[in-house]
């Protein structure tokens, strides 16, 4: 798989750009702040419908405009597929697949498969659990686009149940059986959708675990063994062995957990049980990585998580596009060599760099210079092949 054409309109610092790309390696080169990362961000948005840098879409729209357009033509086993995404301010986003408007944005997920390596990846190890949950959900969605609907359904139920809990906490309606019956309905829905999301995550972690261990040893030979596991907000024994076929068990456990913690949830007005509170645990040896790993170990583990994702996508039968956003500048020589070795086998690698010396020696790559110029609407990014 590779991206043959890539176009932007009013995305971040770009008023417009059209790039013809080829298999192999392309380096987007230029000083920091010129808009290189914005290119990678747009490609990642085409993969996951989300940015790796911000949690909302509004910052993606160039200042002074009302919408951004991201267009890609993806070639997969000789067949082309065009994706056009319209990111709008004040109304719903829209997507086209092969120029035809689709009913929902999620229909384009999975057309472009990519793995992103970025400086923000350090948060996978050192940051909040939400970063690690998002890593799992993004990968699960790229591999199985139907998971996007599962996530959306769960998030919707979670918002509605949380709103009900807050109203109950404020109004103290606990003696109103009708209101409590309504909460029972939302408990059932949360358990149903939550079990489906948990099952997908647990199955994914079981597949990722051996790949993470291998990738970490490649990056840090002789170091402590890296391991990952899924820790639920419920006390489920042997959860590492729970797969998608155990959805009924997970649903029953979620319902039991919601019942047990109902009084506390009513007191606090928040939902305390469900996959939105689960954790992907990362360990080096017998210690948790967060708080105990060195800076170098943390980087190695973060890259190992991305390499593991890359290997799973390859095993699915489609070679993913590798997106490397200034990561060589963050790594020491040994880790650079290890990552470069993996990248050499990829069908397409798109790299950003502010310094030529950060790119591995001997790489045969097309270089594209990214610069800034003045326009009537302010400074905008441009490319010089």
From Swiss-Prot:
The keyword DNA-binding applies. GO terms for cellular component: cytoplasm. Gene3D superfamilies: P-loop containing nucleotide triphosphate hydrolases, RecF/RecN/SMC, N-terminal domain. GO terms for molecular function: ATP binding; single-stranded DNA binding. SUPFAM superfamilies: P-loop containing nucleoside triphosphate hydrolases. Keywords: ATP-binding, Cytoplasm, DNA damage, DNA repair, DNA replication, DNA-binding, Nucleotide-binding, SOS response. It comes from the Bacteria. It is found in: Cytoplasm. GO terms for biological process: DNA replication; DNA synthesis involved in DNA repair; double-strand break repair; SOS response. ATP binds at residues 30-37. PROSITE patterns: RECF_1, RECF_2. The keyword Ligase does not apply. CDD domains: ABC_RecF. NCBIfam families: recf (TIGR00611). The RecF protein is involved in DNA metabolism; it is required for DNA replication and normal SOS inducibility. RecF binds preferentially to single-stranded, linear DNA. It also seems to bind ATP. HAMAP family: RecF. Belongs to the RecF family. This is DNA replication and repair protein RecF. It comes from Mycobacterium leprae (strain TN). The gene is recF.
